[in-house]
């Protein structure tokens, strides 16, 4: 039985196994508190995320279960990886992942990025998205603060709690407004992996300019800012809007022409502008895919088709439509955690030659 120790962080009880020491608060999210710590077993710095009251409601239980399943399934250099998970005696859940020193939001607010860093960061974002999308997963909430970076400029995408299945009927909006694809914002009926490419395009533009590309005050203002630059959406795209109110709003706007992005990004090289043009397209069907974007000339210094892996198997979303009571989610969660530790123990035994 693991020994647990308690610490008070921001008035919150952190109850962790004695394997972890030197707890320091890193950040507070909507669903949990994150601390850095030292892993006594590996001597590595780690991030420990406490999921607050994961079993308080069926919705929270399902969200936590989804994040756990995704973290277990997604294994890629540009995706944050799970190194431990446990349930404390108080029945809080703790995810332990690798610790990266900063995130893209902090980098962007501290100084302008040089060209080679912009290229390398965008390459890694798209490399991660290619893998995630091949697993049948859409992140849906890609933004600079969800993109972690270490001192070697290695980049990892995190926070898959809002991720959803690739589903033609996906609806609702979840991502931070500035980076939200128009098909989510306008509640068009269908959206898919292309929403992440739009978000990546907004992040790319922010790296080039040093400030958000579409800083809308609300949804109406956001859409207006987008059309000022990209013009009015084509009619065939407008007709995919399901909400009558949204459709009337879009049709009431003055017609605008798309502006050449080269006029706005005067300091960017033509190849960068060309890739951005292909990422920020109203029609999701005409928006470049992550795999195609990786092969764009702008990313030629890093592109290596033999080192841009896809997922070995699709993620199993069969649980996602389930409407289950908290106790059932809890049993499923315990089962997943036991499975994680059994698989982990077997892998370590294999590495040690079965000794």
Curated annotation (Swiss-Prot):
EC number in record: 2.7.11.24
Short motif TXY, span: 171-173
Active site: 141 (proton acceptor)
Post-translational note: Dually phosphorylated on Thr-171 and Tyr-173, which activates the enzyme.
GO biological process: cellular response to oxidative stress; osmosensory signaling pathway; stress-activated MAPK cascade
Modification Phosphothreonine occurs at: 171
Regulation (activators, inhibitors): Activated by tyrosine and threonine phosphorylation.
This protein's UniProt keywords: Activator, ATP-binding, Cytoplasm, Kinase, Magnesium, Metal-binding, Nucleotide-binding, Nucleus, Phosphoprotein, Serine/threonine-protein kinase, Transcription, Transcription regulation, Transferase
Top-level taxon of the source organism: Eukaryota
Sequence ranges assigned to domain Protein kinase in this UniProt record: 20-299
Principal place of residence: cytoplasm
Residue sites binding ATP per the record: 26-34, 49
Phosphotyrosine: residues bearing it: 173
SMART domains: S_TKc (SM00220)
Coiled-coil region list: none
Reactions accelerated catalytically: L-seryl-[protein] + ATP = O-phospho-L-seryl-[protein] + ADP + H(+); L-threonyl-[protein] + ATP = O-phospho-L-threonyl-[protein] + ADP + H(+)
Domain notes: The TXY motif contains the threonine and tyrosine residues whose phosphorylation activates the MAP kinases.
Family recorded in the similarity comment: Belongs to the protein kinase superfamily. Ser/Thr protein kinase family. MAP kinase subfamily. HOG1 sub-subfamily.
Protein known as: Mitogen-activated protein kinase HOG1
Organism: Phaeosphaeria nodorum (strain SN15 / ATCC MYA-4574 / FGSC 10173)
Gene that produces this protein: HOG1
């Amino acid at each position: 039985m693991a020994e647990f120790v308690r610490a008070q962080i921001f008035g919150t009880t952190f109850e962790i196994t004695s394997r972890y020491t030197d707890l320091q608060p890193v950040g507070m999210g909507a669903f949990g508190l994150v601390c850095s710590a030292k892993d006594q077993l590996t001597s590595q710095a780690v991030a420990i995320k406490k999921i607050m009251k994961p079993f308080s409601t069926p919705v929270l239980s399902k969200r936590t279960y989804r994040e756990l399943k995704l973290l277990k399934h997604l294994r890629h250099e540009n995706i944050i990886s799970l190194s431990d998970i446990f349930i404390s005696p108080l029945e809080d859940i703790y995810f332990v992942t690798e610790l990266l020193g900063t995130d893209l939001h902090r980098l962007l607010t501290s100084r302008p990025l040089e060209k080679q860093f912009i290229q390398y960061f965008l390459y890694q974002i798209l490399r991660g998205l290619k893998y995630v999308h091949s697993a049948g997963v859409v992140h849906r909430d890609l933004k600079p603060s969800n993109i972690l970076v270490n001192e070697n400029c290695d980049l990892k995408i995190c926070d898959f709690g809002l991720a959803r299945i690739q589903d033609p009927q996906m609806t609702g909006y979840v991502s931070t407004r500035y980076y939200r694809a128009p098909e989510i914002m306008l509640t068009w009926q269908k959206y898919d992996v292309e929403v992440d490419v739009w978000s990546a395009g907004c992040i790319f533009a922010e790296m080039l300019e040093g400030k958000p590309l579409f800083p809308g005050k609300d949804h109406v203002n956001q859409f207006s800012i987008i059309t000022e630059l990209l013009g009015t959406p084509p009619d065939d795209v407008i007709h995919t809007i399901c909400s009558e109110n949204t459709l009337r709003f879009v049709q009431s706007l003055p017609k605008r022409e798309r502006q050449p992005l080269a006029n706005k990004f005067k300091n960017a090289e033509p190849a960068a502008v060309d890739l951005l043009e292909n990422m920020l397209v109203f029609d999701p069907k005409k928006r470049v895919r992550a795999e195609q974007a990786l092969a764009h000339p702008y990313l030629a210094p890093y592109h290596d088709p033999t080192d841009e892996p896809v997922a070995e198997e699709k993620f199993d979303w069969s649980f996602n439509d389930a409407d289950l009571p908290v106790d059932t989610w809890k049993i499923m969660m315990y089962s997943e955690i036991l499975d994680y530790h059994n698989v982990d123990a077997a892998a370590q035994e294999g590495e040690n030659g079965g000794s």
